[in-house]
Amino acid sequence: MMDLGDKINPNLSFLGINCVSFNQSPDILESLHQALPNMALLAYPNSGEVYDTEKKIWLPNSDKLNSWDTVVKQYISSGARIIGGCCRTSPKDIQEISAAVKKYT
């Protein structure tokens, strides 16, 4: 039986998640790490804000479970080598990501 690792192109340098829920991203990345423990991973979650399609506005993430510090620590322990942000991440978010990367690497 072939596992997921046998199906990955050997020329692939990184695999990751992009524009996914801030709250769900650590679990998703950990699942990738479990399936591909030797693959370098990357994580670019969104800010967690939610777009209200009726009002056509972005709403703050009232269900944000963790800080960037906590999430970045989880990413690193799950094999992330590149960490950033996607939709609606702010310069403040990037500063927090950078500080956490420096703290945990």
Swiss-Prot record:
GO MF annotation terms: methyltransferase activity
Coiled coil: none
Domain of life per record: Eukaryota
UniProt-listed Pfam families: S-methyl_trans
Domain Hcy-binding: 1-101
GO biological process, one term: methylation
Keyword Transferase in annotation: yes
Swiss-Prot/TrEMBL keywords: Methyltransferase, Transferase
PANTHER family in the cross-refs: HOMOCYSTEINE S-METHYLTRANSFERASE 1-RELATED, SLR1189 PROTEIN
Name the UniProt record assigns to this protein: Putative uncharacterized protein YMR321C
Protein source organism: Saccharomyces cerevisiae (strain ATCC 204508 / S288c) (Baker's yeast)
Lineage, uppermost ranks: Eukaryota, Fungi, Dikarya, Ascomycota, Saccharomycotina
